[in-house]
UniProtKB/Swiss-Prot annotation:
Aux/IAA proteins are short-lived transcriptional factors that function as repressors of early auxin response genes at low auxin concentrations. Repression is thought to result from the interaction with auxin response factors (ARFs), proteins that bind to the auxin-responsive promoter element (AuxRE). Formation of heterodimers with ARF proteins may alter their ability to modulate early auxin response genes expression. It is found in: Nucleus. This is Auxin-responsive protein IAA10. The gene is IAA10. It holds the Pfam family AUX_IAA. Its main location: nucleus. Keywords: Auxin signaling pathway, Nucleus, Repressor, Transcription, Transcription regulation. Residues 1-43, 62-90 are annotated as: Disordered. It comes from Arabidopsis thaliana (Mouse-ear cress). Belongs to the Aux/IAA family. A motif (EAR-like (transcriptional repression)) lies at residues 45-49. It comes from the Eukaryota. Residues 80-89 have a biased composition (Low complexity). GO terms for cellular component: nucleus.
Length: 261
């Protein structure tokens, strides 16, 4: 059509005085514009689908990241809690571990008892030894003191003999023993003692008889008392004689005839 045409589209828009080509273009544009709702709806659908897919991706990424964070935090917590657990376990193991068995405890107790017993025995033995040593020392000292106190050495001289001698009066118990001792010292001097003459010396010692006390001999025994007076041996009891004698002398009878008178 060469004239003006009126075209009414579905949208109600009117186009006047357009040529045919323009009319076709207008028809196409009208068709395109006749379905704006469908294009919009498709676009919205695409957008909605894209958004939903994006949201799902975001949610999945968020969930994966959160799960990874949760795992990491759990790993860190487990790693942090493992030293504490290990320390607690170490403490629990260190205290009272390994346990002592009954036989070991008994052996330790018996060993301690044996050591204590040995120590007590050794200390007791040491105490007894010390005590015995002290007692022995005391006894030795007592014997030494007793011997030093009780030994009563008295000098004895004889007329005509230059060398004097000493006799222990406490070793004797009577005048007869003193007489025999002086007789052996001055009158019956044995030869040097050997195996051959030992028996002879014993025989002389046992069988020798003296008459120094009865006055029938050439010599008599006198003593000097604490006052310096000379007296005849045998005129007083033996114990009194021991308490007063200071010196002994064997005199000739002719010289000592007036002694003690």
């Amino acid at each position: 059509m060469n004239g003006l045409q009126e075209v009414c589209s579905s949208s109600g828009s009117v186009m006047i005085g357009l040529p045919a080509e323009e009319d076709e273009n207008a028809a196409h544009s009208s068709e395109d514009s006749s379905c704006p709702d469908e294009s919009v709806s498709e676009t919205e659908l695409d957008l909605a689908l894209g958004l939903s897919i994006g949201r799902r991706k975001v949610r999945s990424s968020l969930s994966s990241s959160s799960s990874s964070l949760t795992r990491e935090s759990g790993t860190k917590r487990s790693a942090d809690s493992s030293p504490a657990a290990a320390s607690n376990a170490t403490r629990q193991v260190a205290v009272g571990w390994p346990p002592l068995r009954t036989y070991r405890i008994n052996s330790l107790v018996n060993q301690a008892k044996s050591l204590a017993t040995e120590g007590g025995l050794s200390s007791g033995i040491q105490k007894e030894t010390t005590k015995s040593v002290v007692v022995a020392a005391k006894n030795d000292d007592a014997c030494f003191i007793k011997s030093s106190r009780t030994s009563m050495l008295v000098k004895v001289t004889m007329d005509g003999v230059i060398i004097g001698r000493k006799v222990d009066l406490n070793a004797l118990d009577s005048y007869a023993a003193l007489e025999k001792t002086l007789d052996l010292m001055f009158f019956q001097i044995p030869s040097p003692v050997t195996r051959s003459n030992t028996q002879g010396y014993k025989t002389i010692k046992e069988t020798c008889t003296s008459k120094l006390l009865d006055g029938s001999s050439e010599y008599i025994i006198t003593y000097q008392d604490k006052d310096g007076d000379w007296m005849l041996v045998g005129d007083v009891p033996w114990q009194m004689f021991l308490g007063s004698v200071t010196r002994l002398r064997i005199m000739k009878t002719s010289i000592g005839a007036g002694v003690g008178k």
